[in-house]
């Protein structure tokens, strides 16, 4: 099925991104013979359209910066792919899809070093700007703690549409594969993420961010919980 033929309300929703489609098709190619691939992809497309017809319509469509590559709607498409192909796709392959969407932008920023005050302050400003943009849409409810030189950056989401979607439609089990990319992205900036909970397994998604040389990192060792989430003690 052509993307243009997909029956979704484009006045309030957006289509999955081209990079997302490419990643999903690559996984379908990995697991299915050629004669089945088109039909499997169409199942994913139809599931996407079906669930969007039951989903909230206030996320801003193309106007909302969260709806681009690797964002809310790509996460929804990835969950639909998981729903159709869960019998063959692995957890690691699901992680790879989101990593391949998110990490290229961070790889371009390898020169950033959060251990240095200049970059740490610049990152903080980026988060405060993001909060203002979140406040305009009330999709991801974001709160950034005031900056302190001697402490890690801290912010949290108390609402996350991707998590909300996962819980509503029964995909909470695969959310760790989508959330874990936050750790990998920070590592590319000489930073570390310290997290204890997410909007799926708790009431918030917390982000404590410091340089990879900060003693705070050793004080909060990372582990994977029984559901596959990367977390910290």
Predicted regions: what they are:
Residues 1-85:
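N-terminal, charged low-complexity regulatory/assembly segments
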Residues 70-168:
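Amphipathic interaction/junction segments at domain boundaries or subunit interfaces
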Residues 76, 80, 181, 202:
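Short, well-structured alpha-helical interface segments that form or flank functional binding sites
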Residues 141-201:
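Short, hydrophobic/π-rich interface segment
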Residues 162-164, 212-219:
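Short, charged/polar, Gly/Pro-enriched secondary-structure boundary elements
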Residues 184, 222-233:
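Short, cationic low-complexity segments
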Residues 196, 202-212:
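C-terminal edge-of-domain segments
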Residues 206-208, 219, 225:
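N-terminal functional module detector in eukaryotic proteins
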């Amino acid at each position: 099925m052509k993307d243009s033929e997909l029956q979704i309300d484009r006045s309030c929703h957006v289509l999955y991104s081209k990079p997302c489609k490419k990643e999903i098709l690559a996984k379908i190619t990995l697991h299915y013979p050629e004669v089945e691939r088109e039909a499997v992809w169409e199942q994913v497309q139809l599931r996407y359209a079906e669930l969007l017809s039951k989903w909230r319509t206030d996320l801003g469509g193309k106007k909302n910066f969260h709806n681009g590559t690797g964002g809310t709607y790509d996460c929804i498409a990835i969950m639909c792919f998981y729903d159709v192909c869960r019998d063959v796709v692995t957890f690691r392959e699901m992680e790879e899809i989101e990593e391949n969407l998110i990490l290229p932008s961070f790889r371009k920023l390898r020169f950033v070093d959060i251990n240095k005050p200049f970059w740490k302050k610049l990152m903080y400003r980026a988060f405060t700007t993001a909060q203002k943009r979140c406040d305009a849409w009330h999709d991801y409810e974001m709160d950034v703690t005031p900056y302190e030189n001697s402490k890690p950056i801290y912010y949290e989401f108390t609402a996350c549409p991707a998590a909300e979607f996962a819980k509503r439609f029964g995909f909470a089990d695969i959310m760790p594969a989508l959330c874990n990319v936050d750790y990998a992205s920070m590592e590319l900036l000489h930073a570390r993420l310290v997290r204890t909970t997410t909007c799926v397994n708790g009431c918030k998604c917390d982000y404590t961010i410091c340089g990879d040389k900060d003693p705070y990192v050793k004080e909060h060792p990372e582990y994977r919980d029984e559901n596959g989430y990367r977390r910290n003690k």
